[in-house]
Amino acid sequence: MAASVMLSSVTLKPAGFTVEKTAARGLPSLTRARPSFKIVASGVKKIKTDKPFGINGSMDLRDGVDASGRKGKGYGVYKYVDKYGANVDGYSPIYNENEWSASGDVYKGGVTGLAIWAVTLAGILAGGALLVYNTSALAQ
């Protein structure tokens, strides 16, 4: 009986949907302020290379067309040598022949470096084997 009295006194009324345009404290604003400084490029920076990186300038296309069906213009990778000082492979080459060591016969770390490398590798392998053994049924 008490429950029916409470239910009759509580009624739900639908409320209209309204949006208030008040700024909440602590929340960032969606409007952006204009920056006080301007970034200006200083010009074209040419890459200095003795010879361009990459393959030769000719392009060997099957039936004379590329993958999209367009006829090749024959630029190859050397199109930008005069403009930027290097071809498209010259912007971030993987290696530079001028930075190679004189010979690859001797490890620069010497015998001590090889010994440290071997001990480290053996320790990693032994530690892995120990972990496998300790978590297996053989350790029980």
UniProtKB/Swiss-Prot annotation:
Q: Which InterPro entries would you find in this protein's record?
A: PSII_PsbR (IPR006814)
Q: Which GO terms describe its biological process?
A: photosystem II oxygen evolving complex assembly
Q: Name one GO molecular function term.
A: mRNA binding
For this UniProt entry, what's an example GO CC term?
chloroplast
Gene name of this polypeptide? PSBR
Write the protein's name: Photosystem II 10 kDa polypeptide, chloroplastic
Localization terms from the record? Plastid, Chloroplast thylakoid membrane
- Here the transit peptide covers 1-41
- UniProt keyword annotations, A-Z: Chloroplast, Membrane, Phosphoprotein, Photosynthesis, Photosystem II, Plastid, Thylakoid, Transit peptide
Q: Which Pfam families does the UniProt entry name for this protein?
A: PsbR
Q: Which domain of life is it from?
A: Eukaryota
Entry annotated with the keyword Ubl conjugation: no
Residues bearing PTM Phosphoserine: S58
Belongs to which family?
Belongs to the psbR family.
Function field? Associated with the oxygen-evolving complex of photosystem II.
